[in-house]
Design a protein with these regions (language model features):
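ATP/NTP-dependent adenylation/nucleotidyl-transfer catalytic domains that generate, transfer
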Residues: 1-69
Length: 69
């Protein structure tokens, strides 16, 4: 899933989310992002684009890790 995470991060970068990192857990992509990006990631229309990008990379789902350090 490392390749899938890299693919997802590349696509997220094209969406303007270059500081977002993708971590895989049981086929689900967990995003860690600066607080300033979290609201944008969670709201349409960007939310839909993020979900499409992550699923296109091979993940079954996507979540945002709000407790990342």
């Amino acid at each position: 899933m490392v390749i899938e995470a890299e693919m997802a991060e590349a696509e997220l970068g094209r969406l303007g989310l270059s500081d977002v990192r993708v971590h895989h857990r049981a086929g689900v992509a967990w995003l860690t992002a600066p607080a300033s990006d979290v609201a944008a990631i969670a709201c349409d229309p960007l939310r839909g684009e993020v979900v499409r990008a992550v699923r296109a990379a091979g993940f079954a789902g996507v979540g945002v890790d709000l407790d990342a350090h």
